[in-house]
Design a protein with these regions (language model features):
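N-terminal beta-strand motif that seeds the catalytic metal site of vicinal oxygen chelate
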Residues: 1-17, 70-73, 124-135
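Short, charged/polar surface micro-motifs in flexible loops or helix N-caps
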Residues: 47-51, 60-61, 78-82
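Exposed loop/turn and edge beta-strand positions of beta-sandwich/beta-sheet ligand-binding modules
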Residues: 37-39, 69, 107
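Vicinal oxygen chelate
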Residues: 32, 75, 84-135
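Core segments of cupin and vicinal oxygen chelate
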Residues: 2, 9-51
Length: 135
């Protein structure tokens, strides 16, 4: 049986652009691991134990195919409008303005942005998110 979720890995081309993006979301650098042909930068949110692994394959220039199986990662944010303003300063715009999914105000407002490699990130306003329990 699995005992602990360790990390989620995404492959990135431009580590500096990716670091700027994730740091704008509030992620902090936690570590780095180097190999001959690749290196990983580990990031996490200040009050969260989950880790995001950004993997750079040295010498790769072409964009990664995100594929049709991946949909998104989700993070809660304490000030969605403020975060979107900071991201806009970097030229990052949401797919569409914040909204309540399906008109469900009990869930709160969300929106989606894409990181520099096209990975979609769901931003959930309000700072907390309980796993939905619809019957």
């Amino acid at each position: 049986m699995a005992t602990r979720f360790v990390h989620t890995c995404v492959r990135v081309r431009d580590i500096e652009a990716s670091l700027r993006f994730y740091e704008a979301l509030g992620y902090e650098r936690r570590g780095k691991l180097r190999f001959e042909t690749a290196y990983n930068v580990y990031m996490g949110l200040p009050e969260d134990g989950d880790t995001l692994e950004l993997t750079v394959n040295v010498g790769r220039e072409e964009r990664y195919d995100v594929g049709d199986g991946y949909n998104h990662m989700a993070v809660t944010v304490d000030d969605l409008d403020g975060l979107l303003a900071r991201l806009a300063e970097q030229g990052i715009q949401p797919e569409k303005p914040p909204y309540a999914p399906g008109g469900r105000e009990d869930i709160g407002r969300i929106c989606f942005v894409a990181d520099p490699d096209g990975y979609r990130i769901e931003l959930i306003d309000g700072g907390s998110f309980a796993t939905p329990q619809d019957d």
